[in-house]
Curated annotation (Swiss-Prot):
GO biological-process terms attached to the record: chemotaxis
Subcellular location: Membrane; Secreted
Signal peptide positions on this chain: 1-19
One Pfam family this sequence matches: CAP
Gene: crisp-a
Similarity comment: family membership: Belongs to the CRISP family.
Source species of the chain: Xenopus tropicalis
Gene3D superfamilies xrefs: CAP (3.40.33.10)
Name the UniProt record assigns to this protein: Allurin
Amino acid sequence: MDTFNFIICISALFHSTYGDDGGTPMLDTETQNYLVDLHNLLRRSVDPTAKDMLKMEWSPGAALNAQNAAAKCVMQHSSATERQIQDPFNYVCGENIYVTTAKPDWAAAVNSWFNERNDFTYGVGPNSDKMIGHYTQVAWAKTYLLGCGLAFCPGNYYPYVSICHYCPMGNMINSIKTPYEAGEWCASCPESCEDKLCTSNPTA
């Protein structure tokens, strides 16, 4: 049977695993590194190119929150408080959710979010009424911390729940059309650049 999937996102439009076994095991180091590398690869591929795109790194705090959110097995976003981390700074994080009927592959989840760029025009926003918030969160320049979790929820129609948290959150309503500053790669990095991404540690 074909795998059905459904995706949701939240990032303050201002406006291994599983859920029912009594625990919330974290993703292993190999998976963490893969997810960071995949996000950075996609962030390097934005079009137009980005002057200020930060390199992502793993956040244990964001990962714990994402895992706890997945393990709740509910089809709704976690609250701002549940998406908050204190280290290295006090951030509220954005949240992307991907649910499937079969155990997902993380590449499919992350690429499904990023592929919303096909319905997005930089400086204009979504084409018609298309969903683009997953893409803009993945491509949000000032987001640099990532944490993800996965849970199996056998009582759900879509039993596999994959969640990533992004800190600090993106998708601020006043800049949703420009999730990063367009221009020559790394032209606006405050200090260093590594393979098209800014590597300076942000401040609060």
